[in-house]
Amino acid sequence: MPTSADDSLPLEDSEECDAYIAKFLRPRTHLFSTVKQEKQRRESHDNKYETAVRSKAIMPSQASKVYRKEMFYSTSKCDSRFINNLHTFNTFDGGSGYSEASPHYAMDFVKNKGFADDEMAGHLKSLEVSRKMTENVKWLNDNRNDLKTALRRSNSCPEFPIDRDREKITTLRRNEKRNENAKISNFDASFVPELCCSDDYPSILCSIATAFKTVVSRVNAQSIGSGELKIAKVLCSTEDLFAYVIPKRFNTRDALFAFSNQFRAWLEYKPNVQLYTHYRFINVILYLEEFKHERTEFRRARHVCNLKSRRNHGLFLELDTGMLRVVEITPEKVRFLANSWAHNPSAIVEVRFDGVKNEKDISEEIQAIRNTGRATMISFDREHREHMNGKWPNPRTWSSLGTVVLRRECTHHKDHSKPPLTRLFCEDRDCIGLCSTGDYFKVPIPEEPNPSHDKLVELRARFASERTLGYTDRTPIAAYILPNTDAHQNELIPDFFSRVQFLNGYSGPSGLAIITLNEAMFWVDNGLLKSAESQVDDRSWTVKEYQSVEEVINWLAKILPPKSKVGFDPTLVSYTWHQQALQSMTSDRFELVAIPGNIVDEIWRMRPFQRGDVVKMLDKNTPEIPVHVKIDRLRKSLKPNKCLAAVITSLEDIMWLLNIRGNDLPYNPVTYSYLFITMSDVRLFIDAKRLNDVSKAYFARQSIDVDDYKAASPYIYDWISATKSSFADKKILISPETNYLIGRLIGEDHSMIDPSIMERIKKIKNTDQLKGMRASNLRDSIAIVEFLCKFEKERRDGYTFTEYELAADIEEVKTRNREYIGLKQPTIFSAGEHSSVHAHRPDAQKIVFHYQQFMFQTGSHYTDGATNCARTIWDSYPTEEFMNQYTLVLKGHIRLASASFPKTLTYGSRLDIFARIALWDAGLDYDHETGHSVGHFLNIRDTQIVIGREPYSSNSIIEAGQVMTIEPGYYSEGMYGIRIGNCYETVDVTLSQNDQYFLRFEPLTLIPIQTSIVNKDLLTSEEINWLNKYHFKVFSKIGYILRKENRMEEYDWLFNACQPI
C-alpha cells in the first residue's frame, strides 16, 4: 500500500487510496454478490407467494414478509419460527423446495424436530396447512390440547392474510358499525393474549377493530399538547389506516388508583346497593383479584366480544392500560360501568398518519415510532364536546376528542469522513480483511433530531415578520423576552401557556427565556437550576442562574448591537419588572418594545387545549367570610391610601374575595379572571365558558357585574379616560403581579403598587378556617402514617418500588378520605442522589432500595383546609456524616418551632436564622426559603409572607392566626438530600417575666420524625425535650384515632415510631 507524502494526512484520504482499496476488495466481490442474490431471491419468492394466495382468494393479511423473523413466536426455541410464511425452510439452499402451487402439509415443517408421538405425526401428515386450519384446531382441542403449541408454531400463513391495497380511501369519516372485514394489524406483541390458536380468531380481530373504532375516540379526553409526542406503546392499527397508541404522558398508575378508589368509596358510600350491579355488554368494571395488593383491582373496560372457545368468558379492553383481558363473566368479576366513569380520560389515543395511503405505509410509520418512541403531532381531527353537553356526563370542552394526526420524526445523518483502513481488519494477526468489510461500509449513525433548534430558527424568522415590524418602526427585533408564566404571573401554569416548555423542554415553575439572533438563554432560580439543566435541550440553549433584573439587562446590553430593539409580550412581563428593567439601563443600547400577541404562538401550530370548567361557589358550610364583608374591608383600606379603585390580577386574591374556585391551573383551584373594584361597583372579567346559570345568579346576588375576560384592559382604559378629572392626586391600587399591558394603562403617576393591603385583609384566618386547617392536617397526618407503616412492612417483605410508585401510593392513601380534593403541589419523592435536587420529580425508573435514604414532600387540598409536610427516611444503616447533617437540620427545625418572638414587627427574615444557625456553625446551608404561609383551599402559599434570607418587607410581618410551614433542609450534591417540614399555626403566648405579648408556633402536622438516624449527642436537653413532647402529642392524637378505628397495625407502628429518645 502507498504511503502518504504528508505524514499528517491519513492514508485513506490520499488520492490514490481508493484505487488500492478497490483492487484489494475485487477478489472478494462474490461475497457481496451472493448476499445480494439471496436478498433478491427472497423478495421474488414473497411476491410470487402473495400473487398465489390472492388467486386462491385466501383471506388477505397484514403479516410482514421479513425473513427469519416471526412476530409472535420470535422468542420460541423452535426452528419453525425462522420459516417465512412456511415457504422458506432453509435460507441457504434455495428454499424449502415447495412451490407456491404445491400442497403444504404440517408434518413437512416439523419433521426431524424430534417428534416421538406417532399419533401426532400421523395426523399432521394428513393435514394441509393452508386449507384445514379449523380441522387442525378442532382435532387438537378434542384429542391433544397439550400439543397445540407445537402445531401453532408450524401454522402461521392461514392466520395472516396478505395486505390489501387501500389507496382509494379518501375520507376520514369512519363507518363505526360492525364490519365483518374489519381487522387489526401491526399489533404489539403483548397486545393479543393467548388468542392466536383460537378457532374464532378472525372474528376476535374483527371485534377488536370494531371496539377501537366505536369507543376510543369517543372517550379520549386527554388534553394533548403540540409538537413532539412521546409514545409508550403502539397497540395496533386497523384496516382503514387508523392506529391506537398510549402516550407516555398519560399517568396509567394514577388513573388506575383514582378509579379503584372512586369505585371502592362508592361501594362504601352506598351500603345498601347491590354488590354486583347489573352487567351490560358495553362499558364494564372488571374485578381483577391479582391486582388487589396494588389496590387497583377495579378496572374500567370495554366489552369486545364473547369467546366461543371458552365458555362464559369474554374479551375486554381496559381503558386505562390498553390491555386486552380474558375474564370469566360472573356477577363478581364483570359489572356495569356508569357513563360518568366511562367517559373520563382514556389511556388510548386514536391517531392517523399524514400522507399514509396504504397498509404498507402505516406499517412503516408504526415501526419508526416503535424504534424512536416518538412522533410529531401536526394537527387534530377535532370534534368538540359542547354540542354534546346534553348527552355526555362531565363534559370537558377543553379536551381533545377526535383523532391526532402524526408525522414521524425526521432523522438526519451526520457528515462523516472515510473510515480508517484499519477498520477492514480485525485484531486477529492473520486477518486478510474478509471478516470486517461490512464494518468498513457501515451506514452512518442517524443523528438525533433537534426540534428545539428548528423551533428557534422558525421563531427568529418572526423577528422581522410584517406583524412584528408594525410595532417596532419597521426595525426587526434583536431579541425576544419570554417569561415562563401567564398573564397573572403564576408559577405553575397549564400546558396551554407553557411556551417555554414548547421551545426548550423545561417543565418546572418560573424561569425567564431570552432568545437573540445567535443565542438562547434560559434563566432560572438557583433552587431549580439542576432540574432545568436536566430538562433543557443543551444543544440549543444555555441555562443560567437568575439573580436580578439588572443582571439580565446588563447581559443584553453586552451582546446586542447599538440601537437594538428587544420585544416582549406585554401580558407576560409584569409592570414592576418592566420598571426595574428601565431603571437598570445605563445606556440607550437597546429599547424594550411591547409586541401584543405572543410570537411563539405563531409557530405553535398544535397548541394544547385550554383546560378549565365552570367555576364553583364555595359551599355554605365552608368557613369563609361573606363576599360583601371582604369587599367592604378592601374599600376601607383604599380610602386612607387615596385610591379610587383597585385592579386585582392575582387569581388567588380574586377567588378568595368572591368565594369561588376553578380548575384552570394545575394544583391551584383558580380560574383566569380580572377583578375591578371601585367605591361603588365590582366588575369581574371572566371567560363566558366558565359560567353557567348557577354562577350567573350567584354573581347577580352579590351585585357583581360580569364581563368577558378579554374586555378587561379596554374597560379599564375607558374608565380611566372617563374619570380623569377626578384623579388629581388619586391613584388606582395594583399588585406586583399586574402585567405591563394593564399597568401602562394606569401609568406610574396614578398607580399604587402595594401588596400589603390585600395581604392584611386575607392573611389572618378566622376561627372556623383555623379549625378546618387543624382537622385537614390531622387527616393528612393519619394518611402519611398509614403510608409509612405500609411501606416499611412491604420493604421488609422484599417488595421493590420506584419513586413514581411511592409518590402515587402517598396520594392513594389520601384519596380514601371523603374531604380530600386533590394535590396542592406535585408530590416530591426522591431516593439517594435524586434527593440532592430539592425540586426533583419522581422517576418511574428509579428503584428505591432498602439501604437508600429517601425524602418526600407532599401537600393537599381538603374541603376545609390545606396541608404541607416533608420527611426524610433511612431505615438501614446511615453513614455518620448523614446522621450528623440530619441532626443539624432537625436542630434548626426544633429551634425555630420552639421559638417565641414579639407579636409586633416580627418579619420572616428575622426568624430564618433560627433554622440555619446549626448548619452555619458546621459550614453548611441550603438554597431555598425555610417556610411560607399556607392558603386555605387555595394556592400553595396565600400571601407573600415567607421565612427566608430575603430582606424583609412590610407585608411579611408574622401575626397570630396564620398558618406557616417550617421546612429546613440540606442537600449534599450527588449524594442525598434532607428535609423536615411541618405546618404550624401562630398562636399568642404570654411570657410570665413581663406580661408582654409574644407569638409561638403550634404544630398542625402530626407525623413522627425518624429518631433512629439522629445523633443524640448533637442535641441539647431542651431540643430532646421538644422532640419527645412532639412525639407524645403525635401519639396521643393520631394513636387515639387509629385505636378507635381498630387499625392496630398502624397503631403499633406509630407506638414504636414515637418512643422517646
UniProtKB/Swiss-Prot annotation:
Transmembrane feature ranges: none
Subcellular location: Cytoplasm, Perinuclear region; Cytoplasm, P-body
Pfam families the UniProt entry points to: Creatinase_N, Creatinase_N_2, Peptidase_M24, Peptidase_M24_C
GO cellular component: P-body; perinuclear region of cytoplasm
Family the entry assigns: Belongs to the peptidase M24B family.
Subunit and partners: May interact with pid-2, app-1 and prmt-5.
Function as written in the Swiss-Prot or TrEMBL entry: Together with pid-4, it is involved in gene silencing mediated by a class of 21 nucleotide PIWI-interacting RNAs (piRNAs) that possess a uracil residue at the 5'-end (also called 21U-RNAs) and guide the Piwi protein prg-1 to its DNA targets for silencing. Together with pid-4, it is required for the biogenesis of secondary and tertiary 22G-siRNAs. Specifically, promotes the production of 22G-siRNAs from the 5' end of target mRNAs.
Classification via PANTHER family: PROTEIN PID-5, XAA-PRO AMINOPEPTIDASE 1
Protein name: Protein pid-5
Protein's organism: Caenorhabditis elegans
